[in-house]
């Protein structure tokens, strides 16, 4: 998430039931994660906390990045372990999970629903940086710059289909560390805050 408007790596837990105080965990490795999906599910050793996808906001001249993987926190070792990237069996492209939801299925699966299209969202959140960079270059044609500014202004005005939200169930197996997709439906194509 964010803290004071900047991406954060902080992670906390509270004992359940009866907890009354937050306990700080080791920081989530890698880039900050805004709008990830999260779930508690079993791996081969017991319950773990899974944090998947999200995006690292732009910081200065560093562009925003949509994460294509996730991390598993194992309470028994108090450590984070990198999950496989979201490249489901048979796919050549990596997927992202920003603004989606996670639901447990059975004893070792997590089903992810919805979320933004990685390429469209990443282009949109980085468009202001691209405009800044191109505005500083006198060789850039004004029409190109105006088109980018128009795209920035119109980004939130398109019909829902234009955004190509994820319309497949994305399923992660916690023991084999693998991804598959299943079932396509426009009803799955949602993004939430």
Functional labels for PLM-detected ranges:
Residues 1-193:
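Kelch-like beta-propeller repeat domains
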């Amino acid at each position: 998430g964010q803290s004071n408007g900047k991406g954060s790596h902080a992670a906390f837990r509270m004992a359940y039931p009866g907890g009354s105080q937050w306990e700080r965990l080791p920081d989530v490795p890698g880039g900050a994660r805004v709008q990830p999906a999260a779930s508690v599910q079993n791996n081969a050793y017991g319950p773990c906390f899974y944090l998947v996808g999200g995006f690292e906001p732009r910081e200065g001249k560093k562009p925003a990045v949509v994460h294509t993987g996730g991390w598993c926190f194992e309470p028994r070792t108090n450590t984070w372990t990198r999950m496989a990237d979201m490249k489901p069996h048979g796919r050549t492209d990596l997927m992202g999970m920003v603004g989606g939801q996670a639901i447990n299925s059975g004893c070792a699966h997590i089903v992810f629903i919805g979320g933004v299209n990685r390429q469209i969202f990443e282009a949109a959140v980085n468009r202001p940086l691209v405009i800044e960079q191109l505005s500083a270059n006198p060789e850039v044609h004004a029409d190109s710059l105006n088109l980018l500014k128009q795209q920035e202004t119109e980004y939130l005005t398109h019909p829902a289909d234009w955004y190509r939200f994820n319309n497949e169930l994305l399923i992660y197996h916690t023991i084999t560390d693998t991804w598959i997709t299943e079932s396509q439906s426009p009803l799955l194509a949602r993004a939430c805050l």
